[in-house]
């Protein structure tokens, strides 16, 4: 096991970023669909 405390693998950054983007888009469309997005 190599020490990776000071360096984050790119695949972890890509995975987390992808999940956050998909989550934000999902919340946005869900809010618009339920009518809550109109107040934003």
UniProtKB/Swiss-Prot annotation:
Gene3D superfamilies: 6.10.250.2070
Family: Belongs to the PsbJ family.
Listed InterPro entries: PSII_PsbJ (IPR002682), PSII_PsbJ_sf (IPR037267)
Name the UniProt record assigns to this protein: Photosystem II reaction center protein J
Quaternary structure, from the entry: PSII is composed of 1 copy each of membrane proteins PsbA, PsbB, PsbC, PsbD, PsbE, PsbF, PsbH, PsbI, PsbJ, PsbK, PsbL, PsbM, PsbT, PsbX, PsbY, PsbZ, Psb30/Ycf12, at least 3 peripheral proteins of the oxygen-evolving complex and a large number of cofactors. It forms dimeric complexes.
Membrane-spanning residues: 10-30
Matching SUPFAM superfamilies: Photosystem II reaction center protein J, PsbJ (SSF161021)
GO biological process, any: photosynthesis
UniProt KW keywords: Membrane, Photosynthesis, Photosystem II, Plastid, Reaction center, Transmembrane, Transmembrane helix
Domain of life the protein comes from: Eukaryota
Gene Ontology cellular-component annotations: photosystem II reaction center; plastid membrane; thylakoid membrane
Known function: One of the components of the core complex of photosystem II (PSII). PSII is a light-driven water:plastoquinone oxidoreductase that uses light energy to abstract electrons from H(2)O, generating O(2) and a proton gradient subsequently used for ATP formation. It consists of a core antenna complex that captures photons, and an electron transfer chain that converts photonic excitation into a charge separation.
Subcellular location: Plastid membrane
Membrane topology: Single-pass membrane protein
Pfam families, alphabetized: PsbJ
């Amino acid at each position: 096991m190599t020490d990776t405390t000071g360096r984050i693998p790119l695949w972890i950054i890509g995975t987390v970023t992808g999940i956050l983007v998909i989550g934000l888009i999902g919340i946005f469309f869900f809010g618009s669909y339920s009518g809550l997005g109109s107040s934003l």
